[in-house]
């Protein structure tokens, strides 16, 4: 029998009726809008859309590297915020006057430093929508679409790479994926999960040891070629991290095992190893099919860092480099590097997220059952509490390009790298410092490190192309990374001519 | 998508955004979907072929929007504001378009330099002392944008830890670092944000959670007594996190008192977390709330909360940037550049190495609104909160549970916690309003926050009308259920005891070391479990830790070691409930009831008949809808 709905006319004891508002609206100041109204936003937005389209369309014409010196910006703008609102037209004008002179143009076809940072129109537009919805998705209910789109997008992405089902939420097991801001955060989160897991294991074996005694014995491993964020994760996590000597820039299982056995003999407790697929220096690939089983044998957490190269695994021809992935406990790559998704979008999968959830979160799970992955509280899978609606840009990019066009994008960059490598080899003054992998060419002038430092300085000083150096075992070389989605074959010819011209200049000066 | 299509689709998105924000009041605040709703709406794999843009936009409305909790809705009163404004959206759009990654100055000079300058702009507007501003003559400080306040607390705690360990190693060169780490103690109020606890777990240090006063404010004497006691036990205080504007009740720790007391403990890092309230200090009349800031080593506030700036934009200032960066520096060759010594390189100031060009949106917002416009906006929210407070005070059935200083009002029906939990639940389930609870002074309270950018007095009145309607119905029902009341009282007592027990637990130093004996003198021990012999160095005061699997060895990872003790787990969950939402999808409620793990939540069953009643109610027209109808009528003339 349903309850009779209450009627507003039923009297109550309250002298002011049913307690409803009876304060006059006039008591407040008249409403003064301080907001930019929609029509103004549309004008500003249209100008911005046009600006962005023209900027990216004509980016070749800009000098890739700015000529400014540190402190250039301060004299150009006031030293305090304006008291009164400014016109949007003035803000727009300052973009060219103030900002652009100091921008390093990462999307210029002449930018060959670091690794690509992706940029595409679908991602830009999706981020606009994310900004408008402006929800903060730290729990499922804080915005269900935010969480659930992320769950599905991580499964889409995992399938594109053919990750083992244990990593995917749709398998119904413990595993699942999460979008982090950067690979640095993924590496740290994995380390913290590994630490929690090992501490519990050791505590069960040695109840008399306190956790700080155990902490002092923990040791993690990575190749001497691993990214600096791995070393930093060890620093932040308060544990020792051993560098394992690589062979031809690649970490082998035997070397890892030797390091582990040596540490065990000294009474230390190995707990974590980072296997890198695509190192920053030379895009080398650790032997995951060797290191993974070694890690499993010694009960270490294996984290795979494929920040740049992971995008290439959407192409079947590169998946052999992932061999051994089933032995990993966590895997990370950055769609925001090479998959046309704007920064920040770092994809991370965990076979068992409960170790991460329990490692550093203060809101423990209510029920001790395997998470189904339908509605994870992602704030427990990451360091910050709040999170943006990043899955939107992944969703837009994957749908608007389709897998086939993303594959084509990857393959095109790999071909450009080969093209540049061929140009190097054809010039007897130059040599390759490492095998060409993916979109990276490592090259140098034959001879001393000093000559190559001078060459790089000259190349970058001309401002027409931008490279950065790397050093492996005291050999200094130049890194030519294929970065821009606007790059054409002609751009590679142009870049080679720049390198060659700089070398010519150096020869003439001798 | 080429640039021609981008221009077209970009403007279509602008239209969509304008339409979304203009008609937002017509949507339910919270979605009515259940967990897993989206999985069945989307294909399990990415499309092989490109899809049509129009199809994607249809999916945004048909599949995404049904699952969106509308944080910008005028009826969203949960948490704190999530900043959103047109200038901010466009600043982010430009940041995306430029697409540089600012880990070093050379990686894009404008990215670094605009951040330095804009942080000085904001620091000046707030009224921070000169030593926090990077470009002031002689300053060693500076500001940086982080993703969230959690990271501000974490990086400052990491820096404090590094500094403390360095000092301890100098004093005890032969002691293993793990043992030195076990001596470190951090402090915060019970009302502090959970990110302080999370940071302590990541840093692997002990955190002592202290009892605030009756106004939920942490006092200087409390800090002093705790630190003195810990020092006597051989522990090393190294970090204090204070809050200006707590999440639960917007309370303010007593910074002048705490700062003075810390003068007695050199080497302790004092951090001030003003994530929400810090924005309001751009108003001169609110600057007194910042009193004592000169004692602080670091300060953070989130423009992405109350300064109309989109997430992520959390600003952190430090007094001495070298102490921050030296804890975080890892410096490979490929990140070095010719100007490394002359420029600030922000990759050393945070956990991630890579970073977005976030300063653009802050720059756009500060210029588009001006300080005066932002001041007006903040004052408007405070007025709205005061208006709501007055409405609550006029109704004798309700009470106010905090000092309403800014935009947050904590209130409840007089009566049991269960009664208030029911009230919040039925309101949130209706989707007309969205609020969250908090625990303040061991009582369940409802948080009402003035959030929406264009909120009006009518919105406040309308929200109050909704609350009163639901309260009337609930109280009517309660009057006919005396037996239920008796049981409620019993359950309330049980919950109160559990909560009280837990609060005592987390503030009791015995949690950290059950062997602590306040009546006894500290024992000196020449023996260390470390294999390193400390011969020749000063003995370290160390107390024996008893082996007792039921006691908490240390705060970090405590849940792992006590995972078999479900009662404690349940108690712990109550501590942090204020961060969770009270909305429970129907299936979750039923599943939860059948769950194998007991939890206090299962004891607080929800009444299905109430839900049925709610479903029968017709949606109430909001004032904005009325105004829109009037506007339409006017247009016909």
Curated annotation (Swiss-Prot), chain A:
Give the active-site positions: 227
UniProt tissue specificity: Hypoderm isoform is expressed only in hypodermal epithelium and the CNS isoform only in central nervous system. Expressed in the adult head (at protein level).
Task: Name the positions where pyridoxal 5'-phosphate binds.
Answer: 183-184, 227, 305, 334
> Could you tell me the EC number(s) of this protein?
4.1.1.28
* N6-(pyridoxal phosphate)lysine modifications at: 337
**Superkingdom as given in the UniProt entry:** Eukaryota
Q: List GO terms (cellular component aspect).
A: cytoplasm
Residues holding substrate = 117, 227
Regions of compositional bias (Polar residues) in chain numbering: 1-17
| Annotated SUPFAM superfamilies | PLP-dependent transferases (SSF53383)
Keyword Ubl conjugation listed: no
* Subunit structure comment from the entry: Homodimer.
Q: Which family does it belong to?
A: Belongs to the group II decarboxylase family.
**What is the protein name given in its UniProt record?**
Aromatic-L-amino-acid decarboxylase
Protein source organism: Drosophila melanogaster (Fruit fly)
């Amino acid at each position: 029998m349903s309850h009779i709905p209450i009627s507003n006319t039923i009297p109550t004891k309250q002298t002011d009726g049913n307690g409803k508002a009876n304060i006059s609206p006039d008591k407040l100041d008249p409403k003064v809008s301080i907001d930019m109204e929609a029509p103004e936003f549309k004008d500003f937005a249209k100008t911005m859309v046009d600006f962005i389209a023209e900027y990216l369309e004509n980016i070749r014409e800009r000098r890739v590297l700015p000529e400014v010196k540190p402190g250039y910006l301060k004299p150009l703008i006031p030293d305090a915020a304006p008291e009164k609102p400014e016109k949007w037209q003035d803000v727009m004008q300052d973009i060219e006057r103030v900002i652009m002179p100091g921008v390093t143009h990462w999307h210029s076809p002449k930018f060959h430093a670091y690794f690509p940072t992706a940029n595409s129109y679908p991602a830009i537009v999706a981020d606009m929508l994310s900004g408008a919805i402006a929800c903060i998705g730290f729990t499922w209910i804080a915005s269900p679409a935010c969480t659930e789109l992320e769950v599905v997008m991580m499964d889409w992405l995992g399938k594109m790479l053919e990750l083992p089902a244990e990593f995917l939420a749709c398998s119904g097991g413990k595993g699942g994926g999460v979008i982090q801001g950067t690979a640095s955060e993924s590496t740290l989160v994995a380390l913290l999960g590994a630490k929690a897991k090992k501490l519990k294991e050791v505590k069960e074996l040695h109840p008399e040891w306190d956790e700080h005694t155990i902490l002092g014995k923990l040791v993690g491993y990575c190749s001497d070629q691993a990214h600096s964020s791995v070393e930093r994760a060890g620093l932040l996590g308060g544990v020792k991290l051993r560098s394992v000597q690589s062979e031809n820039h690649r970490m082998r299982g035997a070397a890892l095992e030797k390091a582990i056995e040596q540490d065990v003999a000294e009474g230390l407790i190995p707990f974590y190893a980072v296997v890198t697929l695509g190192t920053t220096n030379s895009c080398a690939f650790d032997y995951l099919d060797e290191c993974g089983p070694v890690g499993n044998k010694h009960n270490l957490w294996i984290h795979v860092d494929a920040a740049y190269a992971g995008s290439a695994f959407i192409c079947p021809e590169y998946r052999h480099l992932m061999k051994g992935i089933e032995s990993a406990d966590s895997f990370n790559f950055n769609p925001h590097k090479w998959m046309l998704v704007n920064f920040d979008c770092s994809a991370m999968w965990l076979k068992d997220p409960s170790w991460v959830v329990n490692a550093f979160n203060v809101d423990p799970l209510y029920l001790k059952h395997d998470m189904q992955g339908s509605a994870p509280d992602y704030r427990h899978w990451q360091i910050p509490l709040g999170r943006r609606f990043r899955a939107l840009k992944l969703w837009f990019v994957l749908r608007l390009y389709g897998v086939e066009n993303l594959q084509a994008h990857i393959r095109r960059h790999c071909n450009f790298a080969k093209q540049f490598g061929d140009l190097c080899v054809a010039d007897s003054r130059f040599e390759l410092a490492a095998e060409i992998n993916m979109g990276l060419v490592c090259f140098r002038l034959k001879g001393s490190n000093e000559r190559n430092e001078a060459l790089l300085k000259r190349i970058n000083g001309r401002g027409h192309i931008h490279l950065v150096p790397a050093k492996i075992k005291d050999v200094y070389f130049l890194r030519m990374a294929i970065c821009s989605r606007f790059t054409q074959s002609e751009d590679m010819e142009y870049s080679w001519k720049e390198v060659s011209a700089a070398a010519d200049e150096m020869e003439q000066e001798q | 998508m080429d640039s021609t299509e981008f221009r077209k689709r970009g403007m279509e998105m602008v239209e969509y955004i304008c339409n979304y924000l203009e008609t937002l009041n017509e949507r339910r605040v919270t979605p009515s979907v259940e967990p897993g709703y989206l999985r069945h709406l989307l294909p399990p794999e990415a499309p092989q072929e490109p899809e049509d843009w129009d199809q994607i936009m249809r999916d945004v409305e048909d599949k995404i929007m049904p699952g969106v909790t509308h944080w910008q809705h005028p009826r969203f009163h949960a948490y704190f504001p999530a900043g959103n404004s047109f200038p901010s959206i466009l600043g982010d759009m430009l940041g995306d378009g430029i697409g540089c990654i600012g880990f070093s100055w050379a990686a894009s000079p404008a990215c670094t330099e605009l951040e330095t300058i804009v942080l000085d702009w904001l620091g000046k507007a707030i009224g921070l002392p000169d030593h926090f501003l990077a470009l002031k003559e002689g300053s060693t400080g500076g500001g940086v944008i982080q993703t969230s306040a959690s990271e501000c607390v974490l990086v400052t705690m990491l820096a404090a830890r590094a500094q403390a360990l360095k000092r301890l190693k100098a004093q005890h060169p032969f002691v293993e670092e793990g043992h030195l780490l076990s001596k470190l103690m951090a402090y915060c109020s019970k009302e502090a944000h959970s990110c302080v606890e999370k940071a302590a777990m990541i840093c692997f240090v002990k955190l002592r959670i202290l009892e605030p006063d009756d106004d939920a404010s942490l006092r200087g004497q409390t800090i002093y007594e705790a630190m003195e006691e810990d020092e006597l036990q051989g522990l090393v205080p190294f970090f204090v996190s204070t809050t200006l504007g707590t999440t639960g009740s917007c309370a303010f720790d007593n910074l002048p008192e705490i700062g003075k007391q810390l003068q007695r403990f050199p080497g302790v890092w004092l951090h001030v977390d003003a994530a929400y309230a810090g924005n309001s200090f751009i108003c001169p009349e609110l600057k007194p709330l910042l009193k004592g800031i000169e004692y602080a080593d670091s300060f953070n506030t989130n423009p992405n909360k109350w300064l109309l700036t989109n997430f992520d934009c959390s600003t952190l200032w430090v007094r001495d940037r070298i102490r921050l960066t030296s804890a975080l520096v890892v410096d490979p060759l490929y990140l070095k550049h010719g100007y490394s010594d002359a420029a600030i390189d922000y990759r050393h100031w945070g956990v991630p190495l890579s970073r977005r060009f976030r300063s653009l949106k802050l720059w756009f917002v500060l210029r588009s609104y001006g300080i005066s416009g932002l001041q007006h906006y903040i004052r408007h929210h405070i007025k709205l909160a005061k208006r709501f407070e007055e409405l609550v005070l006029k109704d004798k059935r309700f009470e106010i549970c905090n000092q309403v200083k800014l935009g947050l009002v904590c209130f409840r029906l007089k009566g049991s916690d269960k009664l208030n939990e029911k009230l919040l639940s039925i309101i949130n389930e209706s989707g007309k309003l969205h609020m969250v609870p908090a625990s303040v002074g061991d009582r369940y309270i409802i948080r009402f926050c003035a959030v929406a950018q264009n909120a009006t007095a009518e919105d406040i009145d309308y929200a109050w009308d909704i609350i009163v309607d639901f309260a009337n119905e609930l109280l009517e029902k309660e009057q006919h259920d005396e037996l239920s009341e008796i049981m409620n009282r019993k359950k309330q007592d049980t919950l109160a005891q559990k909560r009280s027990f837990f609060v005592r637990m987390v503030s009791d130093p015995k949690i950290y070391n059950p062997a602590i004996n306040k009546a006894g003198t500290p024992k000196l021990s020449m023996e260390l479990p470390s294999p390193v012999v400390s011969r020749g160095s000063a003995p370290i005061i160390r107390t024996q830790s008893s082996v007792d699997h039921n006691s908490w060895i240390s705060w970090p990872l405590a849940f792992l070691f006590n995972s078999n003790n479900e009662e404690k787990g349940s108690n712990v969950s109550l501590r942090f409930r204020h961060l969770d939402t009270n909305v429970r999808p129907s299936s979750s409620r039923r599943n939860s009831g059948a769950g194998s793990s007991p939890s206090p939540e299962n004891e607080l069953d929800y009444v299905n008949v109430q839900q049925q009643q709610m479903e029968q109610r017709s949606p109430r027209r909001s004032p904005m809808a009325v105004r829109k109808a009037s506007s339409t009528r006017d247009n016909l003339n």
